[in-house]
UniProtKB/Swiss-Prot annotation:
Induction: Up-regulated when cells reaches the G(1)/S boundary. Down-regulated by gamma-irradiation. Its main location: nucleus. GO terms for cellular component: Dbf4-dependent protein kinase complex. Residues 21-40 have a biased composition (Basic and acidic residues). Zn(2+) binds at residues 296, 299, 309, 315. One of its GO terms (biological process) is regulation of cell cycle phase transition. This is Protein DBF4 homolog A.
Amino acid sequence: MNSGAMRIHSKGHFQGGIQVKNEKNRPSLKSLKTDNRPEKSKCKPLWEKVFYLDLPSVTISEKLQKDIKDLGGRVEEFLSKDISYLVSNKKEAKYAQTLGQVSPVPSPESAYTAETTSPHPSHDGSSFKSPDRVCLSRGKLLAEKAVKDHDFIPANSILSNALTWGVKILHIDDIRYYIEQKKKELCSLKKSSTSVRDSGKKAGTTIQKARTGRLKKPFLKVEDVNRSYRPFYLQLTSVPSINYATHKPCSPFDIEKPSSVQKQAQPKPRPNTDGDKCGGTPVQLQLKEKRKKGYCECCLQKYEDLETHLLSEKHKNFAQSNQYQVVDDIVSKLVFDFVEYERDTPKKKRIKYSVGSFSSVSANVLKNTEPKEKLQLEPIFQKDMVESNGQLPEEIFQCEDIQCEDIQKPEQRLVLASEPMSYSSTGLKGRDEKAASMLNASEPDIKQKFTQLPPCKNEQEGILDVSEHKLIINRNDLEQRVGDSVGVPRSCVQVSHLSPENSLPQPKLTADTTHFSAKDLQEKDLHFVFGHDSDLVTLNTSKEQLTVKAGTPSCGPQQPNECDTENTDNLPCGKIQRKVRLLLGQKKKNVDPSAELDKKRTEFLPMCEDRTCGSPVQSLLDLFQTSGEKSDFLGFTSYTENSGLCDVLDVWEDENSSSLLSTFFSSPSASTFIGF
């Protein structure tokens, strides 16, 4: 800076009370810029002003610097004499201007007072003498000296240098307030000024500000003719083709959508249900497994495919090393007692059994009032043997003599069992006529014998189970059933006595028991029908209390030759069995025990085979009576759908029903039928 350069200091005050210091005065530039000053002074109040910021905070200084630049000011990084204003946040900056030119250099007055107060007198002998001072106390003198010697602004600081150079000092609070006021004035000026401008100028400014670029082919662009709206465009990957075969609601350009749907649907085929059977995994799962990436901690490397990594040499060497041989030896000694988790075990379909798939028939009747005879027909099973010549084995009914141990024992038991035999249909055709004649032979005599049985009027409790080979009450279908049936039951019946002490108590009814009260059954008959397909077993019970109970005991596949009551209870179970418990309540009758014993003995005498059957009820009764100790039994008759239940119910009279039920429900034992 030239020392000869002249500076013009304007002592006028700037707006807001801030004194303005003009820089170098250049008349040539002033004459050119006189026209632009009023416009810029309104929009930029800090135009041509230079500021120096003495602030320790960087964020505050940056924010203040931005505001100064928005108002037209300029910020310098170095303090010099060209600076217009110094902004500081120190306390001294608030009263630096009010104190005036406070300098750390001693003033002439202080120097003069120091000379006069010095203890040494002057030796020059001049006539000039200091005026007499008023004697002050020692405290006042110390206070005055402290005020004079105190420096409000330390020497060689930024503030002291600014004062010596004539730079205006402003506190940060003052400059902030000034900037806020100017911003409000500018906002009011913008609102009051002409806000409406020419649309062409606005459009020109927007077009200049908008980003421009070239569109890549193929593209679709729509422009406005008046250019009042900006154009809109769409860049395409391929040239679209119009499909005229589409319907009205659909767009003619919607050709790529079904292709995209097909691409998405291709990796989503449903896995085949036979995939597990063939031993292969579905295709979809294989694709997902290949895409999976991972990191092998053993090899310390990433892999793209798990299977390929496991087959690599590096992983094999690690897996086949002998480092973990000790651990393998310990693990091999452990007992394998892991339990398969439910989700790992394959779900098995539950096999549904019908009611007549496999069952047995047994009936127990308990008489508590009058002493009766006790009967037991025990099953004697025989092995399934098929002769090589195709002949059927003989069916045996063995009936032992009835023995009366005690007249006062009121319990009876009847157990019927049959063992199925499977044969070819050709082996049964030859025995059709013979079986029909033998089974229909002794029916009239059976009717006479069974009608003599005393009716069961006492309270009774029975268990009814339906066997795989059902009891059928149709005479006409018996002849057709023998030739067409695949399996012929092979059974034997044994009658013996049981004492009331050996009888087991009746079990309590479980939660799955259905109760039928006598009140509900007073006005109608309840029919129990058990069987598979068209095979039916019908029981007509009127005015009786019934309890139906379901159970699941069954028998094993192989049958022994002979079995007693104790042996049959220990047979293995493997098939479903249904139980029906009947609680029969009847009126009590006092019958002579000796008369009933004579009737019982005459009922089970051997009957002739030459007699013919008279009704479907007697055909059923014929199954339980034999003409001798050994006779042929060729199976049960089938009661088909064509022959209704009405024929059976008409013949089933009150006397026959009571006598038949006494035969079925004559055992007090609570033991269930084991199975065939």
